[in-house]
Amino acid sequence: GLVEVMGGSIEVTTEIGDRVKYDVINLIPPQRAGAIAVQADLVGADKRWCEVNHVTYESVKQKGIHVIGDATIGLPVPKSGTMANSMGKISASAVVHLLGGKEPPQMPPVNVCYSWVSNREAIAVINAYRIAQGKVVMIEQKLTSQNVAVAQNSEGWARSIWNDILG
């Protein structure tokens, strides 16, 4: 990691003492769950992420609080909007079941991510999961070929997920 950024001298210093000059640099801060997760004492021993039950997304530290999306750790899933959307639906179903005194169904998440690779073509990464012994397990990952049809599918997918999330 970086310990110092010297903007005027176009140089950074790393934690091991290396001084690196740059023309253009993209700095990404250390990733972690948001401040609200820290304040609610949901963050685990690593002080960065929230451990959750893989079936309900209930915090392992604070019963009755469910955590979804990028704040979670321990699941073999990408940190993507599609995954957070899937986790949200599964968690909502689990909450309804738990409030009704019923066992939540074991519903694996779903994930599809599209990436444009030219001005006309895209690829898709599709992940399939199952629940095994109370844990989310990836059973298949497929990468589509680069083509125009995938790009067209990505546009429909984007409209659908935006409508689902934003209404």
What do the predicted segments below correspond to?
Residues G1-I10:
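A conserved short coil-to-beta-strand element within the FAD-binding core of flavoproteins
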Residues A35-A37, N111-W116:
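Central beta-strand plus flanking loop segment that forms part of the substrate or channel wall
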Residues L2, V24-R32, V117-E121:
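Glycine-rich beta-alpha junction loops
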Residues R19-K89, H97:
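FAD-site-proximal beta/loop scaffold in flavoenzymes
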Residues A84-P109, S115, W162:
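Internal hydrophobic alpha-helix adjacent to the cofactor/substrate pocket in enzyme cavities
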Residues E15-G17:
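Glycine-centered tight beta-turn/hairpin loop motif at sheet-sheet or coil-to-beta transitions
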Residues A124-G167:
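C-terminal auxiliary extensions adjacent to catalytic cores
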Residues R48-H66, M107, V117-M138:
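FAD-binding beta-loop-beta segment adjacent to the flavin cofactor pocket
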